[in-house]
Amino acid sequence: MSAEVLKVDAANPDPRVLRYAAGWLNRGAVIAVPTDTLYALAADPVNLSAVEEIFRVKGRPESRALPILINSLVYATILARDLPDNFFRLAEACWPGPLTIVVDASNRLPLKVTANTRRIALRWPDSAIVSNLISELGVPLTGTSANISGSPNCASAVEVFTQLGDRIPLILDAGQTNDAVPSTIVELRGEHWCLGREGAIPAGQIEAALGGDEAVPA
């Protein structure tokens, strides 16, 4: 069965479409949604069977953790533990936006989400679709890229359908995303940090936000 493709306005998403998408997520499905960078595979990260389905759909090694999309700092404080001051400085400077911050995880999610590392990758995208869908569902979402592992990232619903149209039930189509560059990844350990990946936010902007905090090799 091929995926259903539903058009959605990126700036003003129809609540009925999001309610329909949330229904799929509540049933443990994996769906594709546009973010402020690329399309992502969204699922309920608390539902272990949904998490396992993501790894199956992508062909993703279970040794790789799943990023989590949030729409408030409240979720960050629930899903992470002992957040350092530099986390909040980065969040204030770059969120909502294309920054993923890796911190110590709490015990609120299945270990498979963190690949048994007890570290969690959090992102608050600048996306009304993602933010409103999280609010509709009542929990954060997984946010791994909507592609087959090792294949090109997808910046449009057409590209997602080409790769995953026979593996997922629903794709929300907001057209081409604004930025085909993935998010920047910063890892925090206490007051030390390292750049895991330079993406849509340049390294200089991260350094400016963190001031005099010491960077360590990745």
Kindly give the residue locations of the regions a language model identified.
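Active-site-adjacent structural elements in enzyme catalytic cores
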Residues: 1-218
